[in-house]
Amino acid sequence: MSRALLSVRGLGVRFLGERSVAALSDVDFDVARGEVLGLLGESGSGKSVTLRTLLGLHAPRTTRVTGQVNFDGEDVLSLPAEALRRYRGGRVSMIFQEPGLAFDPVYTIGAQIAESIRAHDAVDARTATARALEMLERVQIPQAGRRLQAYPHELSGGMRQRAMIALALACRPLLLLADEPTTALDATVQIQILLLLRELQRETGMAMIFVSHDIGAAIEVADRIAVMYAGRIVEENAVAELVAAPRHHYTAGLLASTVGEAERGRPLATIPGAPPDLSAPMQGCAFAPRCVAAVERCRSELPPLVRDGARALACWRPRATGDGDGPRGPIGPS
């Protein structure tokens, strides 16, 4: 891989309070220019925390962030306030999971997009409004001129998400962070948004980190996938290789539990149990209590993330590369 646009090394996030929670631990990954990296995992695995950390959105008084985040040669975690403001929205932008909460309800869609443009580019109000209209047309919102004057609550969920994409791309970012952008949408609209995101990514050449708990959505959009569990990356590989031969037992379980893998007349595969409590001290592999292949070493010794070219794996007892598409039933201990 050529020099990465984004390089994350040893990233850790701990939320402080009555109970200290280790939300991220020793996270490493790179994103090249023009590449789409999928972050995949269950709720609570650290995907959204990763994105918010990349934008510096955590309250410093209640959050301890460690490690390094290097974006295009800059140390993001040490940026002063003004440089961080220019970085957010200008060079790196984010699509939030629920656009209804991300938009200000008392301003029109057009006003909010134009304001973002003027905050990062030296243009007048007329030019900013024209660019806002262009962005709404670009994300295929019908009657874009009329929608420019609409308030967020006047748009459907799918329209609001398209408007959110327009806002995120208005300043031509080098990296787009997409935090489960289709979760709140119906199946038909989900497909439309996924296709739109991929089309815009290819058209602009920007890099993207696509967060999802839906492995099917991640496969459609991403070039590579990093699988997260309990605040750590446990496996990373190119999409085709990850799907054809998952090495980590958690990855195999996610693949096996999709509807596409189901056999008629048989129940859907599941991963028994639940993710661990991240406020409690942890020994060994966090997935060990749910893993059929776990042995004593798995429970007592944390497996490091070992990289081999574009692949990475953290497992003491990985699946053989010829194991196929993953188990067809529960993969946890009986």
Model-derived regions: residue spans:
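Short catalytic/signature loops enriched in Gly
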Residues: 4, 142-146, 236-334
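The feature captures the beta-strand-to-loop junction immediately N-terminal to the Walker
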Residues: 40-42
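Conserved ABC transporter NBD signature motif
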Residues: 63-75
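Conserved ABC ATPase "signature" region
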Residues: 74-75, 127-146, 255-256
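A short, proline-enriched helix->beta-strand linker immediately N-terminal to the Walker B motif
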Residues: 170-174
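P-loop NTP-binding/switch modules centered on Walker-like glycine-rich loops
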Residues: 177, 181, 185-266
